[in-house]
Amino acid sequence: MPETYMEVRMEHTEGFARKAEVLVDEESLIVCDGVSTPEVRCTPGVLESVRFSYPSLEGFEWPQAVKDNPSNRVRLEHVRGWSYAGFGRVISIMPVTIDFGFLQLEDPNWSDDKSLEGKYVKVMIDRLDMGIDDGKQWPEELR
């Protein structure tokens, strides 16, 4: 995933694996807290080395995802809780990385279709997770 600096600030958390409100470059997000521990809630303030991700709870087809964003929108639209409708542009494949404006996220639904690069898509994000970035990512030779 491309390296970009963003300021992430914890505003409030209900605790580990629960709802948290964070600011990402001044954009407010509700996320699943993977930064706190079961024993200690994360205190408000700037967070270092965090990573955002989302699991794939429902499968979809990439051609439909492209059709669902005909106006080429780029944004995360809050649905409820930690769920979002993600509108963005595919910037790479294997894994598929989508630029949602202030966040670039890897989609768990991989594709090796090069024609997907540059396309605007809509994906449903059922749970936006925030955790510690331990630096472990897919090895380059497997991308």
What feature does the model see in each segment?
Residues 19-21, 49-51, 87, 97, ...:
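Beta-strand secondary-structure signal
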Residues 13, 17-18, 143:
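Long, contiguous N-terminal structural blocks used for assembly/anchoring
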Residues 52-82, 126-143:
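OB-fold/S1-family single-stranded nucleic acid-binding modules
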Residues 1-15, 67-96, 122-123:
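Structural detector for short beta-strands of small beta-barrel domains
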Residues 11-13, 25-27, 53-57, 93, ...:
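Generic structural motif
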Residues 24-42, 99-131:
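Beta-strand/loop nucleic-acid-binding surfaces
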Residues 2-9, 110, 114-116, 126, ...:
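Structural preference for solvent-exposed beta-strand-turn elements
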Residues 16-68:
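Acidic (E/D-rich), amphipathic helical modules within compact regulatory domains
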